[in-house]
Amino acid sequence: MKRTNKIKGTLERPRLSVFRSNCHIYAQVIDDSSGMTIVSTSTLDKDVKSLLNNTSTCEASKIVGQVIAKKTLARNIKQVIFDRGKRVYHGRISALAEAARESGLEF
């Protein structure tokens, strides 16, 4: 399925961009109007990696979702726009999104 519109975030409602590779998952909150990354985390971060046995599971994605939500809420940002990239909203992508929602982010 091809998306024709590009997703853009603002300072009030930045973009939560998710990238999934075969081994890791990355999440970052981006303000597209200034081109700045506000917060980011991945399964490569020391605090996240220490909690995991395997970085390519849905459980790892849930932990990344919880961590990105905590970091974003610490910056007083409650609403984001979810950007899954070209990936289908399934598996590790949906696990990260649901964990971020349960931790308090709104999208």
Swiss-Prot record:
SUPFAM superfamilies: Translational machinery components. GO terms for cellular component: chloroplast; ribonucleoprotein complex; ribosome. It is found in: Plastid, Chloroplast. InterPro entries: Ribosomal_uL18_bac-type, Ribosomal_uL18_bac/euk. GO terms for biological process: translation. Keywords: Chloroplast, Plastid, Ribonucleoprotein, Ribosomal protein, RNA-binding, rRNA-binding. It comes from the Eukaryota. Belongs to the universal ribosomal protein uL18 family. This is Large ribosomal subunit protein uL18c. It comes from Guillardia theta. The lineage of its organism: Eukaryota, Cryptophyceae, Pyrenomonadales, Geminigeraceae, Guillardia.
